[in-house]
């Protein structure tokens, strides 16, 4: 499990915005992952992602890493932000855009 923790840690810390999701941004394989992708794309946020369906160790490891039971999981500047419900709520209230801007992540438009 240490190798997967190192992989997760590297992705989270070396990318300003990183999304662990089911599927890919071009082809999300669950509705919740798709919602987060739509929000990030709407805001014009540059982000990287990993498909947890391709690796069982990653799928389980990310849950342990964040102590959060569900996927997708969004990280900004190394900080776990939340899953689909939290991201959607933050977006609807304008908090996600503000958080991204406060962290120095360019946002192309607001909600």
Predicted feature descriptions by range:
Residues 64-70:
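Thiol/disulfide oxidoreductase modules built on the thioredoxin-like
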Residues 76-108:
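Non-catalytic, surface beta->alpha helical segment in thiol-disulfide oxidoreductase systems
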Residues 6, 59-64:
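TIR-domain catalytic/interaction hotspot
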Residues 1-18, 109-111:
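N-terminal leader/targeting and pre-domain segments
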Residues 18-21, 72-77:
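Cytosolic beta-strand hydrophobic patch enriched in CBS
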Residues 9-46:
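Local sequence-structure signature of Cys/Sec-based thiol-disulfide redox active-site neighborhoods
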Residues 45-59:
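Thiol-based oxidoreductase modules, predominantly thioredoxin-like and allied folds used
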